[in-house]
UniProtKB/Swiss-Prot annotation:
Avian ovomucoid consists of three homologous, tandem Kazal family inhibitory domains. This is Ovomucoid. Glycans are attached at N43. It is found in: Secreted. PANTHER family: OVOMUCOID-LIKE-RELATED (PTHR47729:SF1), SERINE PEPTIDASE INHIBITOR, KAZAL TYPE 2, TANDEM DUPLICATE 1-RELATED (PTHR47729).
């Protein structure tokens, strides 16, 4: 199981770096910051499916 440490988030502004992650909602997030903010918004229901595009 792939995991991402989101303890540093949410951050108000995410960088533009592109390191895609695929969430359990089948959406591709452009980087860890955007993914972690979505995890926080989902109250922890969103998980990482795998690294890379969905």
């Amino acid at each position: 199981i792939a995991t991402v440490d989101c303890s540093d988030y949410p951050k108000p502004v995410c960088s533009l770096e592109y390191m895609p992650l695929c969430g359990s909602d089948s959406k591709t997030y452009s980087n860890k910051c955007n993914f972690c903010n979505a995890v926080v918004d989902s109250n922890g229901t969103l998980t990482l499916s795998h690294f890379g595009k969905c």
